[in-house]
Structure formats: structure tokens, C-alpha cells
A protein has these predicted regions:
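Interfacial/gating helices of multi-pass transporter permease domains
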Residues: 1-4, 24-46, 116-120
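Interhelical loop/hinge segments that connect adjacent transmembrane helices in multipass membrane
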Residues: 1-19, 62-79, 199-214, 268-272, ...
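Interfacial transmembrane-helix starts/ends
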Residues: 2-5, 55, 72-102, 119-125, ...
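Short runs within selected transmembrane alpha-helices of multi-pass transporters and secretion channels
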Residues: 11, 15-19, 42-45, 49, ...
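Hydrophobic/aromatic end-of-helix segments at the C-terminal termini of transmembrane alpha-helices
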Residues: 18-26, 30, 59, 102-107
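Helix-loop junctions and terminal segments of transmembrane helices
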Residues: 41, 45-85, 89, 139-144
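Short membrane-interface helical motifs at transmembrane helix boundaries
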Residues: 94-113, 168, 172, 229, ...
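Membrane-proximal transmembrane or re-entrant/amphipathic helices at the cytosolic face
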Residues: 204-205, 228-288
Length: 288
């Protein structure tokens, strides 16, 4: 148990180091203004990560039940990995696209003026962590199978790569440079090393996983075009325009994905959530 807990603890420590190393670099080589700008972007990325972790935590019991079985374990793990990954992709893509099109205004009202670079930093960090987040049920599987040691080692290497890349970039390009270095290290670690590890060690059919994820790309492209069109039509300068944009974009995102991307299981999940929402509205109306 001590061995098991140590590497979970090491994972947590290394992840925190990876997320905070840029602030140390910026403080050492650039200055406090760069730290403030970077911190806003990092904080927004932190919310992005927290949201994704909340979703995957729902499936921890299911993971433990599957791992405890011996028969057909690999098939069930693959099915769960793909199922949760698809759900994560749908939700996180929605959040990412909304931030892509509304993020500048949101930062201006949340942090104030003078933090334009924070928008680009947040985008880069979100892109860098995106693969890890849609696959983070894999972390729970590794822990359940007591195979998480290598992930800790991989992330120690990512920390070293992050440090080596980010220092010269931060010196030359400030907070943006530091974000580029971190993004590159995370994409290398999560996009290449961890996918190979999942494939080789816990027998995840990573090719089938990505085949499922790529089915969302046409819808993502359509929504990106729609978002750019809405940005030209709705100039987001007030909270009213901000809310109108979100409402229109959200409805269109649901329609496009419903018709072209999501499967019957995901449609049933949406129906259940909508029914719960309708029930709560009915209760509120009855009380009034």
C-alpha cells in the first residue's frame, strides 16, 4: 500500500510542479507583470482541468469493478475508455470553443483590462492538456491495476523537458513563451508517451479510441465556422451580447452534435439530464 500511495502522491506533486514551473521561470527571468498575466491563463486552465476530473471521478467505482474481474476485462476497459473519452470530448470541446470565441470578453470583465495575453496563454494550456483530459479515465485504470508508476516517471521527464524548453522561450517571449514551452512538453508527454503506455501496458486499443474521437471532427469544424460567423454578427462588448452568444452557440452545438456526432448512449444521457432539469423547473414553479 505504501508503494501504491507513494506513486499516486508523486503524480500529484509532479503535476503541480508542471503547472507552477512557469511562474517560477517568469519570476526568475522576466518579472511580476508576466507572472500576473500567466497566472490568469493558468487559473482558467485549472478550472478546465477540475471540470474534466469531476466527470471522470464518477466512473471510479465502475473502473474498480471491471479491474476486479478477470474475464473480458480488456474489452470492458476499452469500452469504458472510449465511452468516457467521447463524453469528455463533447463537453470539453464545447467549453473550449466557447472560450475561444468569448474568452477575451470574459477575461476583460473577470480580470480587468491589460490581460490580453492571458487569453492566448489559457488557449495554449487548454490545447496542451486536452488529450490528457479526454483520456484521464486511464489514470483511474492505471491506479486500479497498480500500474501508475511509469506515469509518474513520464511526468518527471515532462517536468525536465518543460524546464529546458520554457526557460529560453520565457527569456525571449515572456509569458507567451513560457506557455509555449509547457504546451510542447505536455503534448509530447500526453499525446505520445502516455498513448503508447496505454496501448502497451493496459491493452487500450488507442487506434479505435482515436477513430471514435475523430468522428467528432466534422461537427467541430462546423461549430468553429458558426462561431466565427457569430463573432462577426455579435460584437461581444456587453454582458447581454455575451449571454446571447452563449445561448445561440449552445443550442446550435447541441443540434449539430445530436444530428451528426453523438451515439444513442450519449443521446440518452442528454435526455436524462434534460428531464431532470424539467423536473426541477416544475418543482420550482409548483413552490411559487
Amino acid at each position: 500500500m505504501g508503494y501504491f500511495s507513494f506513486f499516486i502522491f508523486l503524480n500529484m506533486i509532479v503535476e503541480q510542479i508542471n503547472l507552477s514551473v512557469d511562474n517560477f521561470i517568469l519570476g526568475r527571468y522576466v518579472g511580476t507583470t508576466a507572472i500576473a498575466i500567466y497566472s490568469i491563463g493558468m487559473q482558467l486552465n485549472g478550472y478546465f482541468i477540475t471540470f474534466a476530473n469531476t466527470i471522470s471521478s464518477v466512473f471510479i467505482t465502475k473502473v474498480n469493478m471491471i479491474v476486479a474481474k478477470n474475464e473480458n476485462k480488456d474489452d470492458e476497459i476499452n469500452g469504458l475508455f472510449i465511452k468516457v473519452g467521447r463524453i469528455q470530448f463533447i463537453i470539453l470541446s464545447y467549453i473550449f470553443l466557447l472560450f475561444l470565441f468569448c474568452g477575451r470578453y470574459f477575461i476583460s470583465i473577470w480580470a480587468g483590462e491589460g490581460y490580453n495575453e492571458s487569453y492566448y496563454i489559457a488557449l495554449m494550456l487548454m490545447i496542451a492538456i486536452f488529450i490528457d483530459l479526454i483520456q484521464n479515465i486511464g489514470i483511474k485504470i492505471l491506479e486500479a491495476e497498480n500500474k501508475h508508476k511509469m506515469r509518474s516517471i513520464i511526468f518527471v521527464l515532462i517536468s525536465c523537458i518543460n524546464l529546458l524548453i520554457s526557460i529560453p522561450l520565457a527569456k525571449n517571449y515572456g509569458a507567451i513563451g513560457a506557455a509555449v514551452g509547457t504546451a510542447a512538453a505536455f503534448l509530447l508527454g500526453n499525446g505520445l508517451f502516455m498513448n503508447l503506455y496505454y496501448y502497451k501496458v493496459i491493452n487500450i486499443d488507442i487506434f479505435v479510441f482515436w477513430k471514435n474521437i475523430f468522428k467528432f471532427i466534422p461537427g467541430l469544424i462546423i461549430m468553429s465556422v458558426i462561431g466565427m460567423f457569430l463573432n462577426n454578427v455579435i460584437d461581444i462588448n456587453t454582458s447581454t451580447e455575451f449571454i446571447i452568444f452563449i445561448l445561440i452557440f449552445s443550442v446550435l452545438y447541441l443540434i449539430i452534435n445530436w444530428n451528426f456526432c453523438i451515439n444513442s448512449y450519449e443521446k440518452n444521457l442528454i435526455k436524462v439530464m434534460l428531464n431532470k432539469f424539467k423536473f426541477k423547473l416544475k418543482v420550482v414553479n409548483d413552490l411559487n
